[in-house]
Amino acid sequence: EIESSYALDRLVWQRSNISSTAKTLAYSDIIGFSTYVWNKNYNYTLAKEIKTLNPNATLVFGGPEIAIENKDIFQKYPFMDIVIKSEGEITFKNVLLALKNNKSLEDVPGLLINRKGQLVDTGRAVRINELDCIPSPYLSGVFDDLMKDTQGVEWNATLETNRGCPYGCTFCD
């Protein structure tokens, strides 16, 4: 159902000129940002530029660098529409299905939603216990065209043996 309703048009995996990248992405309906310490500032600048060009684009952020405990997150980052609080694979799929079927995002667990600067927290998503249920982007062909178009680039696969912080501190977990 996702594949027939949405197209994965572009993977931005290298830092390119912000303005040209924003112009390329701006007229997408939904844009996802996987945010880490090494791309956080680039992603935020790119997202601001995209929102300037297309205020109707839905910008979805996730990743370990998003400060989900910050209750003022949408005042600080008003360009964010949706933040996925934990593992994104199933939650992002549920976001896409809700948007496609005109269902309320408030029924999708695991989100922070920006409602005109006010935070709506949809609770916790169910944790993925069996990582084998998630298709590998390498084995499913998601990266095939990208790798073919970038001959000479050394690619590395990531082997995930666990996820998240192992400590389970009460302030975070």
Where on the chain are the PLM-derived regions?
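Glycine-rich beta-alpha loop elements in corrinoid/cobalamin-binding modules
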Residues: 2-130
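Radical SAM [4Fe-4S] cluster-binding motif and immediate context
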Residues: 132-173
